[in-house]
Amino acid sequence: MTFEELNQKWIEDQVTDGNPLQRSTFNRHRDAILNIVGLIIECDQANGYKYYIANPEVLEDDSIERWLFSTLTVSTILSESVAVKDRIILENVPAGEYYLPVLIQAMKLNRRIVMGYQRFDGEPYEKTVEPYSLRLCKQRWYLLVFTGHHIATYALDRMLSVEMTDETFEMPEDFSPEAYFAEYYGVLTDETPMAHVVVRAYGRTSNYLRTLPLHPSQREVTSTEDYTDFCFDIRPTADFIGELLSYDVGLEVLQPADLRERIKRLLDQSLKHYS
């Protein structure tokens, strides 16, 4: 897209009140996009001075850049949709996002934090930890930390306070948050052994799993008019089991046998509430 084409799009946007796009304004926005999202916008002089994204790979699935880009895009669309704001319904995100700025700053500087925390079933306490990574899961933010003894995960909406200290730490060069969670679904990590899980999805559930896979290891094994079998190589923790149960009668666990039996016990226990 040439600068002239960009300018026309800019003028047509109601936010600009029809004012033309200045070259200096465009350059500032281009620099901001690079700093915030990591997208490099370059000009192809040999092709009519058209601007293009030089590194589209940063928008791959599950990347922070893709999430930021999507968030900014949606934010822009919503800001331009005041006339229909009462017809756009958003999910509530718990108040823990209030601590995101200080946590991100502590991660940038590799600073320890003092965190006030209270579990749902516990008393308030303070703890000094090393912030390694942030993870968003099911509308909740979680902080992955090193406590000085082990890796642990804390929910931001259970934090009572966060203070960045002057104490620095060194994050292990070989530690990858993505690799840490790779064998799990959700945020719960424990010693649950790896398993080759096969599930049978009935009706529309097959399409739900195709369009929004539960895990990167998800593969489609068999498909018929009535059902589709999917397999996973995963640690079937409580988070994963809870997700399987959320599909109600649309999903059946076939393998392994011990997981199938565990699901059956959970369903039997649930039925007792209605007896």
Regions found by a protein language model. Give the residues of each.
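DNA-recognition alpha helix
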Residues: 2-17
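Bulky hydrophobic/aromatic content
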Residues: 3-5, 31-118
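A structural signal for short hydrophobic beta-strand segments in well-ordered beta-sheet cores
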Residues: 41, 134, 162, 220-221
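General beta-strand recognition
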Residues: 50, 114, 142-144, 229, ...
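Core beta-strand-centered patch of the WYL/Sm-like small regulatory domain
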Residues: 81-82, 86-198
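Polybasic (Lys/Arg-rich)
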Residues: 182-275
